[in-house]
Amino acid sequence: MNPLIAAASVIAAGLAVGLASIGPGVGQGTAAGQAVEGIARQPEAEGKIRGTLLLSLAFMEALTIYGLVVALALLFANPFV
């Protein structure tokens, strides 16, 4: 493998995981904060808020997993070779 392609693939894999985790990380923090605030305002709706929060966190985490899949493809099944 060309060393330049290998180095670029490693850098791209790191950027893929790093950049793919920024948005979901901010979104998860905001969603959790709003859920805690909603439960504090209306404690009787805790179960409904928690269920909605967990579902939305799972969807947000999927974006990070997609970045990980791209990084693994760049590292182990490099299409540029």
Swiss-Prot record:
Chain's role: F(1)F(0) ATP synthase produces ATP from ADP in the presence of a proton or sodium gradient. F-type ATPases consist of two structural domains, F(1) containing the extramembraneous catalytic core and F(0) containing the membrane proton channel, linked together by a central stalk and a peripheral stalk. During catalysis, ATP synthesis in the catalytic domain of F(1) is coupled via a rotary mechanism of the central stalk subunits to proton translocation.
Signal peptide (residue range): none
Annotated site (Reversibly protonated during proton transport): E61
Subunit structure: F-type ATPases have 2 components, F(1) - the catalytic core - and F(0) - the membrane proton channel. F(1) has five subunits: alpha(3), beta(3), gamma(1), delta(1), epsilon(1). F(0) has four main subunits: a(1), b(1), b'(1) and c(14). The alpha and beta chains form an alternating ring which encloses part of the gamma chain. F(1) is attached to F(0) by a central stalk formed by the gamma and epsilon chains, while a peripheral stalk is formed by the delta, b and b' chains.
NCBIfam families: ATP_synt_c (TIGR01260), PRK07354.1 (NF005608)
Keyword set includes Plastid: yes
Keyword Thylakoid included in the entry's annotation: yes
Main location: plastid
UniProt cross-references to Pfam families, sorted A to Z: ATP-synt_C (PF00137)
Spans traversing the lipid bilayer: 3-23, 57-77
Family, as annotated: Belongs to the ATPase C chain family.
InterPro entries: ATP_synth_csu_bac/chlpt, ATP_synth_F0_csu, ATP_synth_F0_csu_DDCD_BS, ATP_synth_F0_csu_sf, ATPase_proteolipid_c-like_dom, F/V-ATP_Csub_sf
Additional comment: In plastids the F-type ATPase is also known as CF(1)CF(0).
UniProt entry keywords in alphabetical sequence: ATP synthesis, CF(0), Chloroplast, Formylation, Hydrogen ion transport, Ion transport, Lipid-binding, Membrane, Plastid, Thylakoid, Transmembrane, Transmembrane helix, Transport
Location of the protein in the cell: Plastid, Chloroplast thylakoid membrane
Domain of life of the source: Eukaryota
One Gene Ontology cellular component: chloroplast thylakoid membrane
Membrane topology term: Multi-pass membrane protein
GO MF annotations, alphabetized: lipid binding; proton-transporting ATP synthase activity, rotational mechanism
Protein name: ATP synthase subunit c, chloroplastic
Residues the record lists as N-formylmethionine modifications: M1
Listed GO biological process terms: proton motive force-driven ATP synthesis
